[in-house]
Curated annotation (Swiss-Prot):
<feature type="topological domain" description="Extracellular">
    <location>
        <begin position="340"/>
        <end position="601"/>
    </location>
</feature>
<feature type="modified residue" description="N6-carboxylysine">
    <location>
        <position position="405"/>
    </location>
</feature>
<dbReference type="GO" id="GO:0008658">
    <property type="term" value="F:penicillin binding"/>
</dbReference>
<feature type="topological domain" description="Cytoplasmic">
    <location>
        <begin position="27"/>
        <end position="35"/>
    </location>
</feature>
<dbReference type="Pfam" id="PF00905">
    <property type="entry name" value="Transpeptidase"/>
</dbReference>
<keyword id="KW-0812">Transmembrane</keyword>
<feature type="transmembrane region" description="Helical">
    <location>
        <begin position="323"/>
        <end position="339"/>
    </location>
</feature>
<feature type="transmembrane region" description="Helical">
    <location>
        <begin position="116"/>
        <end position="133"/>
    </location>
</feature>
<feature type="topological domain" description="Extracellular">
    <location>
        <begin position="1"/>
        <end position="8"/>
    </location>
</feature>
<feature type="transmembrane region" description="Helical">
    <location>
        <begin position="36"/>
        <end position="52"/>
    </location>
</feature>
<feature type="topological domain" description="Cytoplasmic">
    <location>
        <begin position="134"/>
        <end position="322"/>
    </location>
</feature>
<dbReference type="GO" id="GO:0005886">
    <property type="term" value="C:plasma membrane"/>
</dbReference>
<dbReference type="InterPro" id="IPR012338">
    <property type="entry name" value="Beta-lactam/transpept-like"/>
</dbReference>
<feature type="active site" description="Acyl-ester intermediate">
    <location>
        <position position="402"/>
    </location>
</feature>
<comment type="function">
    <text>Integral membrane protein involved in sensing of the presence of beta-lactam antibiotics and transduction of the information to the cytoplasm. Mechanistically, activation of the signal transducer involves acylation of a serine in the C-terminal sensor domain upon binding of the beta-lactam antibiotic. In turn, a conformational change occurs and the signal is transmitted from the cell surface to the cytoplasm.</text>
</comment>
<dbReference type="Pfam" id="PF05569">
    <property type="entry name" value="Peptidase_M56"/>
</dbReference>
<feature type="topological domain" description="Extracellular">
    <location>
        <begin position="53"/>
        <end position="115"/>
    </location>
</feature>
Length: 601
């Protein structure tokens, strides 16, 4: 997946907005076919889906929308004219294979655009946060100026109402000169604030008001109010979020009205409607960002509340059954769809370890030498134990660069495109920045000099459909084949160091059930050297963006007389992040652990 923020986030918003549009349509079509409570709960759970883009569903995968993501991810083109010779000096005795052969990727201005949109979004969030805090200063002012109710008759009525709805949490009942309509706020310590002048209301009318506000407290509607404010801050740019939030607030009041009507005697139903109208006539103007529940509503929505009162009747078993069915279907759709939205919005896919034998060690000094960050993963076959440095980097996905050529070669062999003894390809005369590339190649020379044009030609002969099937069958990283010939260079295909180690082990043990002769051929092509009876095999990879070293890989394994160690190093930085650097880090760590001693030490 792309490391871009804006495009994946935008795609998630498009998908969520489409989902919200469908939900709104369903609610309108089924307005009288489901209960008022179901309408409210559907709105709430639909809005809960907006959390999904920020939830890391690490163990779920979705490829339904990869084609959309690729519109904005890693928009780059392979540039031969801007290729940069980044060949470094060899490391000690490894002079024969530690070199950086790589073509530069010319990255478009998408990162600048992405950063600009990200800045605009953050600015909008900051403005909305300030506006929300300012709007909710009213609650602080009300608290400072409230007067605790000490009227015995009113307190008696208040406690009677609490008993009727079986609600026993402590609630502070107060009055304030700053409001004209009853208001409720607070979660841990709920407040019900009445207007200062309550003499105009009869006992029955006051009972209607108290029951309504107490139901808000009992149902913890204040949590929903805070949640709706948070959504408006984060998704300030999405009109559907604002619309659905407003609907949820109205339906919250309607469902409270319905609960009150079920509690009241039927003869008081008309009185309840009159109370709603009375407070609406004196409603004061308040902000939609206020994290509180007001008894009064806007004139536009008061009609819906009055219709609920006039048409009130207890839900029939059939209506309850239909409501339960619709709610279950909507909930199922949300649970099924939100992991995909989460993966779309994540900047970098991460795969965590399952319940395995893992130890963490600090190898930061080896990475600090190159002023770069990175991750290291080692797997001990005999002990079935992982050793990891930097869990986050080791389980995050990156473009595989030339390390993918190991599996490109394997597929070409399996497909019959080449064989061990017949893998020759003729150079077409195109001038490349490395003399090793400007000549005919076979599998072994191409793997040794990491000749990109050779493996691109193999991929073209294999075909896109076969490549897609292959990537999925071996579960290579994110399995994203999007840009023919360039997908392992431009970042659409990505894999983590942990996944590199695991797939190398599967390759080594032939868990793919390929021809063993093809496995052995690839093993021979990546065999690097032998030291003290131990054999080192592996492949480096270097990412060069806009002519600058960007990242480096070194993956491989060490065979001893009685064990095999699989490893992967990924390094990224601004100056010295290359395959040769990753190789030096890996060899230093392997030497320190006594797995592959350096000849020079």
């Amino acid at each position: 997946m792309s490391s871009s923020f804006f495009i994946p986030f935008l795609v998630s918003q498009i998908l969520l907005s489409l989902f919200f549009s469908i939900i709104i349509l369903i609610k309108k079509l089924l307005r009288t076919q489901i209960t008022v409570g179901t309408h409210y709960y559907i709105s709430v759970i639909s809005l809960l889906a907006l959390i999904a883009p920020f939830i890391p569903f690490h163990f779920l995968k979705s490829h339904h929308f990869d084609w959309i993501l690729n519109l904005g991810g890693a928009q780059s083109a392979l540039s031969q004219t801007h290729s940069t010779d980044k060949t470094t000096e060899a490391i000690g005795q490894h002079v024969n294979w530690v070199q950086d052969f790589s073509l530069s990727i010319e990255q478009s201005s998408s990162k600048m655009i992405d950063s600009a949109f990200f800045a605009v979004w953050i600015l909008g969030v900051a403005v909305m946060l300030l506006a929300t805090l300012y709007s909710n200063l009213k609650i602080g002012k009300i608290k400072k100026n409230l007067q605790i109710v000490n009227n015995k008759e009113l307190l008696s009525l208040f406690h009677t109402c609490k008993e009727e709805i079986r609600f026993h949490q402590k609630v502070i009942l107060s009055r304030s000169p700053l409001i004209k309509s009853p208001i409720t706020f607070g979660v841990i310590r709920p407040y019900i604030i009445l207007p200062k002048d309550i003499s105009m209301f009869s006992a029955d009318e006051m009972k209607c008001v108290l029951l309504h506000e107490l139901y808000h407290c009992k149902r913890k509607d204040m949590l929903i109010n805070y949640f709706l404010c948070l959504l408006k801050i984060v998704y300030w740019f999405n009109p559907l979020v604002w619309y659905l939030s407003k609907e949820a607030k109205t339906e919250m009041e309607i469902s409270c009205d319905f609960a009150v009507l079920k509690t009241l005697d039927k003869k008081l139903h008309l009185k309840y409607g009159e109370v709603i109208l009375k407070f609406t006539s004196i409603k004061q103007r308040t902000s939609s960002l206020l994290a509180a529940s007001e008894f009064s509503s806007s004139y536009k929505h008061i009609k819906r509340r009055i219709v609920t009162v006039v048409n009130f009747q207890t839900a029939s078993p059939l209506l309850k059954a239909k409501s339960a069915l619709v709610f279950t279907l909507v909930l199922g759709a949300i649970l099924a769809g939100t992991p995909s939205v989460s993966i779309l919005a994540m900047q970098k896919e991460t795969r965590f370890l399952p319940g395995t034998n893992v130890e963490y060690e600090d190898y930061s000094t080896f990475f600090d030498k190159f002023s770069a960050s990175g991750g290291f993963v080692l797997f001990n076959s005999n002990r079935k134990k992982y050793t990891i440095y930097n869990r986050k980097e080791s389980t995050s996905r990156f473009a595989p660069a030339s390390t993918y050529k190991v599996f490109s070669a394997l597929l070409a062999l399996e497909s019959g495109i080449i064989t061990k003894n017949d893998s020759h390809m003729t150079w077409d005369g195109t001038q490349y920045p490395y003399k090793e590339w400007n000549q005919d190649q076979d599998l072994f020379s191409a793997m040794s000099s990491s000749t990109t044009w050779y493996f691109q030609k193999l991929d073209r002969q294999i075909g896109e459909d076969h490549l897609r099937h292959y990537l999925k069958s071996i579960h290579y990283g994110n399995e994203d084949f999007s840009v023919p010939a360039d997908y392992w260079l431009d970042g659409s295909l990505q894999i983590s160091p942990l996944e590199q180690v695991n797939i190398l082990k599967k390759f080594y043990d032939n868990e793919f059930d390929f021809k063993q002769s093809n496995i052995e051929t690839v093993k021979d092509s990546i065999r690097l050297e032998e030291s003290n009876g131990r054999v080192l095999s592996g492949k480096t990879g270097t990412s060069v963006i806009n002519g600058e070293l960007h990242a480096g890989w070194f993956i491989g394994y060490v065979e001893t007389a009685d064990n095999t160690f699989f490893f992967a190093v990924h390094i990224q930085g601004e100056k010295r992040a290359a395959g040769s650097s990753a190789a030096e880090i890996a060899l230093s760590i392997l030497d320190k652990k006594g797995i592959y001693p350096s000849v020079s030490r």
